[in-house]
Amino acid sequence: GKCGDRGETIKTVFAATMDASRALQHKMMDGGADLRKEITAALQDGPIAVAPGECIACAGVEGAYASIAGARLFPGVPIKYYKYFENVFEAVDKGEARYGIIPVENSTAGSVHESYDLIMKYRFFMVGARDEKIEHCLAAHPDTRYEDVESIYSHHQALTQCSNFIENFGFTGITYSNTAAAAKYVAQSDRRDIAAICSPTAAKKYGLQVMKREIQNISNNRTRFVVISKDMQISSDADKISLIFRVPHTTGSLYRVLGRFSMAGLNLTKIESRPMGNGEFSYFFYVDIMGSVRRDVTLDLLCALSDELPGFKFLGNFREQED
């Protein structure tokens, strides 16, 4: 057109201006009122806490990485163990546990899609998080010799995180429900040609000998665990926001949404697409942002997006702990 090379730039600026104008109109018309009400009611004066007599839930058995993260997030709080991630959600849903601790992302293996799928299925919220350094070791029965080991049992994420070690030494990786459960299985088995990939904590707990330490592909191997809750709670020190949404099938629609976060002064720390699984090329986006809903600009934007974007879900605003 007449604008020449600058046409696209002008179009982008114009679109952004229109979006900003729409957001302002949206607030004046009390848009996103339901989300605003829900978020306002969830604001707390202090950190999230577990009442006396309540417990938290995680998958696996004692020594599982989730239980290590849980014990650091909620010191001294009893932990109930369940076999699978979904059992953790069921426990929280039924009130058997106040919160659940589940992994959502690993620095080597990526997002734990099952966790996000379950958060959507149960319509739960993230109310806390912890970024945990994961140190895997190879552990076996005290009577097992290293040269006799052929098969290694562990959770599929742990096998992925230690794939170089497994391939280099010609081991066969066998998927098990959980790293600590794999350690327990190896400890109780009569076989002397198997080992487990687990935490040093789990190896010690089940009386296994540690044959090799730090066998993960990347030395700084980290997993993010989130605290899941049936109801929305936003602690006073919350600094991270998680969202899921879809965008319309129009050119630049995702770019425009991301531009609005930028205009609101929000820093994206994660964006990931996930097929919706309906046979069409439709995608959900997981987005993490540094920020707090206590800031008006942030809350206004989330309320506007909740009305505009299909499949929008505010997953929570929480504090993330690190080592």
List the predicted regions and their residue ranges.
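Domain-level signature for soluble enzymes in the chorismate/prephenate branch of the shikimate pathway
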Residues: G1-D323
